[in-house]
Amino acid sequence: MESNDRSLNIVFKHSGKKTDVSLNSLKGAVVEFLDLYGTIPLAGKKFCSITGEGDGEQRFSNLLKKTGYSSDPKGFFEDLLSILVNGKMKKITVNGIQIPHLMLMSILEQVLPGHGYISIKDTHQLEKTTHIKVSEKDRKQLQQVIETYPVRLSRHTIRQMLVSKDVAYQYLPFVEELDSGGHTNTWIGQFHDGLLEQMYQNRVIFLLNMACPVYCRFCFRKHKDSRNETNPCVEDVKKAVQHVKDSPGVKEIVVTGGDPFLNRANMAATIDGLMQVDHVQTVRLATRSIAYYPDLFLENESAYLKYLKQKSFELQQHGKRMEVATHFIHPDEVSPESLDIICDLVNNGIAVYIQTPFLKDCNDKGPELVRLFSLLRGAGAELHYIYIPCSPIHGNSIYWSTLSEGIRIANHLRAHLSDRIIPRICTATPIGKMDWYSSGWAVEKVKDNENFIWIRTPYTPDYFKTFAPLANELTNIRVNDEGTIDIQYMAKIGDESFLHGPRPEREVTEKKSASSDDIEMLKSELLKERQTGPSIVDAGDNSGFEKLLRLHETRVEIDARAKDAQIDYIRSDDKITDVIISSSTDAIDSLFYIKPLIKKLQDIPHVNAVRLFSSKFNVEPKAYTRAVINTLGDLNKLCVVNPLRLEIETWFTLADEITNTHEKLVRRLNNKGITVYCNTALLGGVNDSDAHIHSLAYSMRKAGIEFHHLYAAGLSIQQKWNRDHPVDSYDVVDIATKVRREGSGREIPRYIISTLLGEVDYGLTSSFVFDNGQVRIKLGCYDLSYYKKLDKNFEFPAGIITDDDGSPLVQVPGLIKINNFPVS
């Protein structure tokens, strides 16, 4: 400690731990935070307005003045630390100013330094380690919990828990875990041999390691028996790899545990073994350590990250890809370290996708999910699933929400999130996942058992015969009249209007097939005519190259030659996160104009993504020369602070359009951290069958293209073609059913209806309303106030009526509905 430095004496109230912290180290941590991370996305708009402009020193000086501690950093820290040591697990304010969570983390790293993780054996150790009070009335029961469901914490999460009840809620044991409600496990009989499990025809699970550095209280493997299982060895891995070699239908392997990254030998044997299996396309590595134990990847000069990047390159040389799956649940879990890990992986061609359990009283209101997903997106992550409800395992009941609450969250996300980061709302049933209102729904309550409901799934008895015949012998399933399986699922429905009964038999309708000439004409029109919907509100001057379309609260589209007026419009509204750039030629032919445009957008902190529309990606992929790819890579800015992510949007109609050339191009772009996503228009008689879309989804997945939107109706081309060649809503559900059942979960698009008032999810954030013989689409995620916040003079266009709850009802030509069943 420097001679002119002073130290602060700290005593944690509940652990009794005493420590001295250098005042200079605290000040240095805050100055560094303000210098590097004190931005609006990371620290908040209000806090940044308080700290003002300048370097970290100046901004800290401004903060001291605003909190009443001008030129008195010691007083400031004494005040802040006096709150922190009480272990209240809450946000901290100093004289009315809330200190950002990430700044508190910077301070705590000085107060409670260290890495690694700790296994907790008793309540006294829990109190000493976390500095959080254990109630005497709960101590005996908590000890029983610890002995039943092991507790393990990282020092990283301990720091987070001290100032976030939402992080503590996930990892601290609680007496309600003794509630016997729920299952012992959710595994019920699909193929299981050693470390290998199989739930789907085309993918298997490798359980490489049974322990984790931190134990989530809601985990479906939380039981002590699961935590203490003997870890497999390299010979077990080789046996599992041989099973994959002997199973040509297996295309993807999910490597999980526990945390598989804790067993380096098994990880190496898995990757090296699967690399030699010709029919394997994707190796997916699952870990939560990015969120709760980032040191695993960053220690030893980021040795594990370097290893993964090398192995990813080797997999690419064998025509395969590596992906990393992780969980984030609340924005308080997001750290600069976790964002840095995601950026590093994605910038090196390794996709990172996020799965989020829906936890009651933690992330079940909407705004916290909007912030969480926005932070992760800028780093390059893809948002994959929200699981509703939390796994129905023993001791998890405090986390359970009703199904209707989970389904309704989709309305908030569709209204307030970029379309590129809206996860699929799904439920993991004991026989496989289903997506709400496309591949499944709640049918009815189970008679004489109020804790279970029947869920319609996309699976059939024949599906399991080749790999898991026991699945058809289960007593909690039934085959419905359409031939798919309904399964009893442990959950409360909540709002009983979400129980929809069985799907009615399909009425026979004539379907007109398109000629080959028609198909070529439609494909050509899709490439020539931009399918963007209209501006949902007045966005000012829309003349010539200065045209700007406000497509959503978060999204605008501009031309490559947009002027300063359009940039000013974007800058003036901090709800805008995404800018789509299109051109009368093609985005890659307009890079001269796009480069300075992106540089201007980089100075707008709330914009974190730019999307370039490129039809040439489809028809002329060789136009993406090395120079073009390098230029695009230079424009892509995946980073922790003020990111600006670059993505390519393209359109395909049929699977035979996708070639090996596209696959190679996607790989080159991915290795620059650039995602390619595709939209598809469902066209009557062209591709409106489950076989067509399943084939298209598979081809996209194989090429590495993300299948983003499958438009059921509403695009300009659909309004023209589908009037005479209508798409049947029944086909939409048949398509979703087959894609979910036969494909990878990573192949599934969002099923979308485009309207003049914005986009909605088929069935999930929209519904069919019958009005005097006409069918209208109810936009459940929007109302008049939504549009008035974007344009105070907005009024609904002529012909738009509203439902009793204020939701607009619109007509969408070309989509027919021949029954009154809510889903299809």
What are the language-model segments listed below?
Residues 1-199, 496-548:
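Flexible, acidic/Gly-rich N-terminal and inter-domain linker regions that tether
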Residues 153, 192-221, 528-564, 568, ...:
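N-terminal pre-triad scaffold of radical SAM enzymes
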Residues 219-231:
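Iron-sulfur (Fe-S) cluster-binding segments and ferredoxin-like electron-carrier domains
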Residues 228, 252-254:
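Internal, well-ordered domain-core segments that constitute the primary functional module
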Residues 233-235:
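Chitinase-like catalytic core of GlcNAc-active glycosidases
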Residues 238-241, 245, 261-417, 564-578, ...:
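Conserved AdoMet/S-adenosylmethionine-binding subsite of the radical SAM
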Residues 405-536, 728-824:
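C-terminal accessory extensions appended to soluble enzyme cores
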